[in-house]
Amino acid sequence: MPRNDSFQRRAFPGGASSLQERPARSVAEMKKQQASKIREIGTALIASGFHALDAQADVLELSRTTTWTIIKSKHKSSGLSVGTLNRMLSARRLPPIVRAKIHEYIRQKAAGLYGDSEKRIRKIAALQSRTSQG
């Protein structure tokens, strides 16, 4: 399958297509930045008045286990899945500040800032185009 060069230029400035070709930022630094951004989602929930895990899970429309994983930054190193992000964004009572943090995370992940593969970036970019804030 041919490489989509316009995607490459947007996702990886300079046309880098793999972790080996990307700038000197280490994978560990990228994952640390990703974990920090995910923690901001939890902080936004607390700032919106959702202190208890049950309340947080309810407003995100996720299971308690998934919510705990997000809040405590115990997620796998690949970050939040497109499915989880979709469920959170479709939550009817999601506070605007939390929604904004999720969109920030999606934008940064789609830009390749967290060291994801091209395939994962394409998936997140598709989610971004479907759910972009106006």
Regions found by a protein language model. Give the residues of each.
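Glycine- and charge-rich intrinsically disordered segments
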Residues: 1-25, 126, 132-134
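N-terminal acidic-hydrophobic amphipathic loop/helix motif that frequently occurs adjacent to catalytic
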Residues: 13-14, 18-30, 98-109
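A short, Lys/Arg-rich alpha-helix, primarily the initiator
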Residues: 18-49
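Helix-turn-helix DNA-binding elements, focusing on the entry/boundary residues of the two helices
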Residues: 52-53
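Short alpha-helical "recognition helix" segments of helix-turn-helix
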Residues: 56-57
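Recognition helix of helix-turn-helix/homeodomain-like DNA-binding domains
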Residues: 61-79
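DNA major-groove recognition helix of helix-turn-helix/homeodomain DNA-binding modules
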Residues: 79-104
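Helix-turn-helix/homeodomain-like alpha-helical modules used for DNA recognition
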Residues: 97-134
